Amino acid sequence: VVITTKSGKQGKTNVSFRSDWGFSNMAIDYRPMLDGDSRRELLWTGLKNYGLYTGNMSDADAATFADQNIEDFASKPSTGWTDWKDLLFRNGSHQNYQLSVSGGNDRTKFYTSVAYTNQEGIIYKQGLERFTGNANLTHKFGDFEVQVTSQFSKVRQNKTNEATSYDGPVANYAFFQSPSSTPYNEDGTLNNGCGVFGVNPLYEREHSSDVYTLMKAFNTIKLTYNIWDKLNLSEKIAYDYAQGTNDVLWDRHSNNGAPGGVMQRIVNRNDQLNTETQLSYINSFGLHNIDALLGFETQDTEYAFNYMAGQDYPGDLYELTNAGSTSAETNRQSYRMTSFLGRANYNYADRYYLGLSYRTDGSSRLARENRWGSFWSVSGAWRFIDESFLNPVKSVLTDGKLRVSYGVNGTQPSDYYAYMNLYKYGIIYNGQSGMSIVGIANPDLKWEKNKTWNIGLDLSFIDRISVTFDYYQRKTSDLIYDLPVSQVGGYYDGNYGYTTPQNIGSLKNSG
């Protein structure tokens, strides 16, 4: 997969600035609600019908019964009916700004840009702020060319929980909270408890928060050496970093946080370091065209997860270090993969095509005996529209190609340590600390292999209508499947799955 970003061009330095502003709201009247008077009338009719058909009352007595009981179901506050949609939703807005500078000469080209986005959501306290930057530089010197790319971003998102529990119920309460409920006390302060479940979503909104911050950086450097004419040697190093932090707070005044407040912090971090060494050759000899490549690749990935929670705060400074009691959970995983690969493509007159590829991958997710897997493919194509015997129909059939391919690829286990015995310390049974098995070793686990062949036909008529036909068959062998494991032996995987991956069965698909 090749991702191309914006780059500079030879010529004068170009400075560009753009900005835009806008507004947003609900596109439709989602879940239309009755106003207070209409709801009161509907409930009054229901009470009257109850008296008529259940209490066997006369029409007049049923109406009196409804008048006597309507205040219990749809009383009108002295301040008027409450429009919860109006209180909880608003018109959102956004503003975007972008500045870029680019330029260069015959040896050096550069491009850099910064951008800022600020959005206010249609729910109060909901919004997003994003800052991004991008820079790339290309410089040629002698037989060398160096390319440097750097991208980074920081996103801060204020969220609101749309659940219907005490964990910050905001949005959903707009659709089933009674207009008879009053969110404010007589002195103008927020009412702590009203309506359905005794929850005031405005009060909960002010005493809870959910902030997610994501920081990402992607940096690459590539050095290319022109050994001879069409023969090039390149080395590329890429580092990808991402860290997301989610801070969720229910203070001591909220329903969920009472009486001492609860704060949770979840941190996810992903690091990936990739290297690519490639020797490539691209050339043409008359009608003969060759594209060949040899490569060596490495991938080093690390994932870290941290969960921290604090509660019983003595005051209103909600940081984990101030909590009366804390708990934590951590998880760290990593894996590496090394690959050797080769590819060769040949075509004659852009009419007859032949392609070959081969690679062997070694993954740390498998035991040493089964770590390496070899995969290959062969393909061919015939652009028959260029044949002279089709000249009479070329005014209608403007393009045609026949394709055929066969290949083998592999899938590694999703679990980083499926081949190893794993143990975990912690509270295991009846509140007692101890150690349990959380991973049963399977040193025989190996690559899942997919063998696929395909035949296809591409047709184009009068340069306007394109038709593609494909038929394929794929057979998967050594299928990786999570096999149930007996709990009698004390196995505990932490997710109550009680499974271990095995290579069992095969699968065939065609279509």
Enumerate the predicted regions with their spans.
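A beta-strand signature from Gram-negative outer-membrane beta-barrel systems
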Residues: 1-18, 94-96, 109, 115-120
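Outer-membrane beta-barrel architecture
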Residues: 16, 100-102, 113, 136, ...
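Transmembrane beta-strand segments that form the barrel wall of outer-membrane beta-barrel proteins
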Residues: 19, 114-120, 354-363
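Outer-membrane beta-barrel initiation region
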Residues: 87-91, 101-105
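Short glycine-rich loop/turn motifs
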Residues: 98, 274, 337-343, 351-353
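Short glycine/threonine-rich loop-to-helix capping motif typified by GTGT followed
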Residues: 368-372
